[in-house]
Amino acid sequence: MTERTFSIIKPDATRRNLTGKVNAVIEDAGLRIVAQKRIRMSRAQAEKFYEVHKERPFFGELVEFMTSAPVVVQVLEGENAVARYREVMGATNPAQAADGTIRKLYAESVGENSVHGSDSLENAKIEIAQFFTEDEIVG
C-alpha cells in the first residue's frame, strides 16, 4: 500500500551538510520525497513535536538539540513508507544499526542520530500536519 511518512533530518546531519547524502539513501530505498523544507525549529514547535517525551529526563536536552541548528522536514511516499523508512533509518543507537542504514552511515550517537521517522501511519499524519499544508505536498 502506498503510504506517506514524516522525516526530519536533524541538526547533527544538517551541520555536517549531509542532507543530499541522506536524501540519496532515502531515494535509493524506493521512497519519493514529495515535500521538503529546511527550517529552524522553534522551541514551541520542538516542545509540541516531542510532547510525548515531556516527562522523560532527556526532554529538555532533546528540545535544545532540535532547536540548535536548521533541520530538514520531509514527507516521504512509497509502498509501506512508514515501515520502509524505519528500516532505512536503522536502530536508534547507531552502534546497533545495520550496515547501509542512515544512522549507521551518519549518526554520531544515540542522542544525535541524524534522522527522525514516524513510528506509525497515524503519527505520520499528525506529524506531517504540524509542518506542511496539503498544498505543499506534491506527489
Swiss-Prot record:
SMART domains the record matches: NDK
Cofactor: Mg(2+)
Any one biological process term the GO annotation gives: UTP biosynthetic process
EC number: 2.7.4.6
Enzyme class label: transferase
Taxonomic superkingdom: Bacteria
Binding-site positions, ATP: K10, F58, R86, T92, R103, N113
UniProt keywords, alphabetically: ATP-binding, Cytoplasm, Kinase, Magnesium, Metal-binding, Nucleotide metabolism, Nucleotide-binding, Phosphoprotein, Transferase
Family annotation (InterPro entries): NDK-like_dom, NDK-like_dom_sf, Nucleoside_diP_kinase, Nucleoside_diP_kinase_AS
Enzyme active site: H116 (pros-phosphohistidine intermediate)
Any one Gene Ontology cellular component term annotated for this protein: cytoplasm
Recorded GO MF terms: ATP binding; metal ion binding; nucleoside diphosphate kinase activity
Keyword check for Ion transport: no
Main location: cytoplasm
Catalytic function, reaction form: a 2'-deoxyribonucleoside 5'-diphosphate + ATP = a 2'-deoxyribonucleoside 5'-triphosphate + ADP; a ribonucleoside 5'-diphosphate + ATP = a ribonucleoside 5'-triphosphate + ADP
Compartment(s) of residence: Cytoplasm
Subunit structure: Homotetramer.
Family matches, as HAMAP family: NDP_kinase
UniProt family annotation: Belongs to the NDK family.
Role of this protein: Major role in the synthesis of nucleoside triphosphates other than ATP. The ATP gamma phosphate is transferred to the NDP beta phosphate via a ping-pong mechanism, using a phosphorylated active-site intermediate.
Name of the protein: Nucleoside diphosphate kinase
